[in-house]
Amino acid sequence: MRLQQVIDRYEEVEARMGATSNTNEIIALSKEHAELRPVVEKARALMTVRKGLSEAEAMIASGDREMAELAEMEIDDLRERLPGLEQEMQLLLLPKDVDDKADIVLEVRAGTGGDEAALFAGDLFRMYTRFAQIMGWSVEIVDVAPGDAGGYKEIIANVSGDGVFGRMKWESGVHRVQRVPATETQGRIHTSAATVAVLPAPENIEIEVRADDIRIDTMRSSGAGGQHVNTTDSAVRITHLPTGIMVTSSEKSQHVNREKAMDQLKIRLYERERAEKDAARSEARASQIGSGDRSQKVRTYNYPENRLTDHRIGLTLYSLDRIITGDKLGDVIEALITEDQSRRLASLEAGA
């Protein structure tokens, strides 16, 4: 029945698209139509196979030898196709994360390990930048604190495009690197870490920020990497008093900075609200991969062995040289998505 309901809704959306002249409604309907199309195409294919199988079984049971022979020729093929179509249909009907299509704020920070941690943070950010290029996404650096020997103590960027959060959300957590630093004369392997945070930045975040709840400070503006921009106090820092969340923006225009800082504040408040809801659903999330918590150790990058291990799913790949360039990062992310889908399907089938 659920499949027919999806098809009915799809046909209703199609009819409304042809009947309305309201631009906003057309945009909303077009978006829903695009989301429903792959589900409906798979549903129709599944229903066709089920119907064909039912008809073939009826023909075999009819006692008509000629009809039964024709049915026998079809039934094996239909039975072979059915399980695959049913699983694909289940995957398409799994509950979606409402933020999967959202843009993100990406934050990479050096952790333990001093200069080597900052260099590793730089490697991670370059990996994400390259992956974004491959995916056709755009990257805008918002704030940078360079490392003393290269890399970054911290770098924050906006990443925009189709389905960014749905793929990048798997990167949140602690990333650990094992390698021989360039400054190491004895050839000893050092371990350091960097922390990655991925915050969804959906359009039109519906969060009200009361004027009484914020303090706005102005300060001297500096650009990415601390380069001096001008001599006016154009940079803006907004502090959200109830939570202690602080955001800054350092463009040349104070007006632009206020807007950007407020947008950043709303994103962080939205993430906080999202995290609280996730915590309330902790039992349901037990079957999913990781928590998105930036304190969770998610991955180890072992350079001497050219090995990457993702600890959440026990995945080990000996192609670190291709992953750290961003070229093969997609393989890791796809493995995480596939495993998450499998676990959620198993949870549904178990009645969880």
Curated annotation (Swiss-Prot):
It comes from the Bacteria. PROSITE patterns: RF_PROK_I. One of its GO terms (molecular function) is translation release factor activity, codon specific. InterPro entries: PCRF, Pep_chain_release_fac_I, Pep_chain_release_fac_I_sf, Prokaryotic/Mito_RF, RF-1. Keywords: Cytoplasm, Methylation, Protein biosynthesis. Gene3D superfamilies: 3.30.160.20, 3.30.70.1660, 6.10.140.1950. Methylated by PrmC. Methylation increases the termination efficiency of RF1. The modification N5-methylglutamine is found at Q227. It is found in: Cytoplasm. Residues 277-303 are annotated as: Disordered. GO terms for cellular component: cytoplasm. SUPFAM superfamilies: Release factor. Belongs to the prokaryotic/mitochondrial release factor family. Peptide chain release factor 1 directs the termination of translation in response to the peptide chain termination codons UAG and UAA. This is Peptide chain release factor 1. It comes from Hyphomonas neptunium (strain ATCC 15444).
